[in-house]
């Protein structure tokens, strides 16, 4: 993770809204199903944290909420996932209008890591090359997950 460079600054208020998962990559040690979900909405809390409302596909679509707590670094947030541990959610790249890329890694075990590419519109492909560049910097083996949008819950 040390060799991955994130954005220097972030306008968190520009993330508000819906995002669709386009593709993801995760290490073998990463077991959280976060990357099987679209983001129904991103909300900014009064404290400057981000609240994600996710749509999880099980036998039906279920809403889940995650709170991303701001840190001293403007592009990083801390997230606690029950039955797991604390993770750092790091925004790697975005143009705010069409795509954003982030990586999520375990604070105590950096081998547990995943990165994802989200888009504003289902048919959007912007950010694909930037996502591939990030994947080339990963030091550990990973699996790429291609998302079939028909299998996802839609906003």
UniProtKB/Swiss-Prot annotation:
Keyword presence, Coiled coil: no
Q: Which gene encodes it?
A: LGB
Q: Which GO terms describe its molecular function?
A: retinol binding
Provide the protein name. Beta-lactoglobulin
Q: Keyword Secreted on this protein?
A: yes
Where does this protein reside within or beyond the cell? Secreted
Family from the record: Belongs to the calycin superfamily. Lipocalin family.
Q: Which cysteines are joined by disulfide bonds?
A: 61-153, 103-115
Gene Ontology CC annotations of this record: extracellular region
Q: What does this protein do?
A: Lactoglobulin is the primary component of whey, it binds retinol and is probably involved in the transport of that molecule.
Chief location category: secreted
Q: Give the record's subunit note.
A: Monomer.
Pfam families, per database record: Lipocalin
Keywords attached to this Swiss-Prot or TrEMBL record, sorted alphabetically, are:
Disulfide bond, Milk protein, Retinol-binding, Secreted, Transport
């Amino acid at each position: 993770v040390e060799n991955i460079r994130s954005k220097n600054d972030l306008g968190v208020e520009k993330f508000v809204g819906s995002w669709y998962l386009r593709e993801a990559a995760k290490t073998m040690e990463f077991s959280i199903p976060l990357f099987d979900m679209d983001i129904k909405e991103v909300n900014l809390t009064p404290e400057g944290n981000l609240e994600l409302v996710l749509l999880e596909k099980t036998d039906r679509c279920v809403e889940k909420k995650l709170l991303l707590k701001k840190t001293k670094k403007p592009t990083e947030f801390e997230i606690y996932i029950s039955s797991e541990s604390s993770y750092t959610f790091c925004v790697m790249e975005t143009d705010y209008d069409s795509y954003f890329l982030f990586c999520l890694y375990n604070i105590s075990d950096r081998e547990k890591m995943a990165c994802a590419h989200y888009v504003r519109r289902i048919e959007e492909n912007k950010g694909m090359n930037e996502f591939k560049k990030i994947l080339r910097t990963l030091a550990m083996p990973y699996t790429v997950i291609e998302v079939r949008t028909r299998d996802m819950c839609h906003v």
